[in-house]
């Protein structure tokens, strides 16, 4: 599972996801990509599930790039705990994704293989997304 090696602070505010993605919204490495169409938090487990799905489908051919990284800690309080006494402890990590952000990129395979592999990964994501290809 992806998570930062070390962070400056253990806990973070939740924040707001407004507007479109201004960075990471163009294909940089591969020829095909999965692009987010909605704002959300994507957990490290969901990122890993999508990566595994693409890798399994593509087998040996091709290369995969994961373009998002879970760098935001999400805290949870223990169940049946009374309110107060501070913020809960960090439980898992999420990547903040805005519309337009590239989630995965793929190269070295045919478009049919890439489309099928990326659609499997898209079904594992909690948002609507689209398959895009590099226009040369």
UniProtKB/Swiss-Prot annotation:
Pfam families, alphabetically? Ribosomal_L16
GO molecular function ontology, one term from the record: rRNA binding
For whether the record's keyword set contains Zinc-finger, the answer is no
Has UniProt tagged this entry with the keyword Zinc? Answer: no
Instruction: Point out the coiled-coil segments of this chain.
Output: none
Q: Which InterPro entries match?
A: Ribosomal_uL16, Ribosomal_uL16_bact-type, Ribosomal_uL16_CS, Ribosomal_uL16_dom, Ribosomal_uL16_sf
Protein's GO biological process: mitochondrial translation
Give the GO cellular component terms, alphabetically. chloroplast; mitochondrial large ribosomal subunit
List locations, semicolon-separated. Answer: Plastid, Chloroplast
Where are the residues of the annotated region Disordered? 1-20
Task: Report keywords, A-Z.
Answer: Chloroplast, Plastid, Ribonucleoprotein, Ribosomal protein
Q: Which HAMAP family match?
A: Ribosomal_uL16
Assembly and partners are described as: Part of the 50S ribosomal subunit.
Q: Which family does the entry's similarity section mention?
A: Belongs to the universal ribosomal protein uL16 family.
Q: What is this protein called?
A: Large ribosomal subunit protein uL16c
Q: Which organism is it from?
A: Brachypodium distachyon
């Amino acid at each position: 599972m992806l998570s930062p090696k070390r962070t400056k602070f253990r806990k973070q505010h939740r924040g707001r996801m407004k507007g479109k993605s201004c960075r990471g919204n163009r294909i940089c490495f591969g020829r095909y990509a999965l692009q987010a169409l909605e704002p959300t938090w994507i957990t490290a487990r969901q990122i890993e599930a999508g990566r595994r799905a693409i890798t399994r489908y593509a087998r040996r051919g091709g290369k995969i790039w994961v373009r998002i990284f879970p760098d935001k800690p999400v805290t949870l309080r223990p169940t049946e705990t009374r309110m107060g006494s501070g913020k809960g402890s960090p439980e898992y990590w999420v990547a903040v994704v805005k519309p337009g952000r590239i989630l995965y990129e793929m190269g070295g395979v045919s478009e049919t293989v890439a489309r099928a592999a990326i659609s499997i990964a898209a079904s594992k994501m909690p948002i609507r997304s689209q398959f895009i290809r590099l226009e040369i």
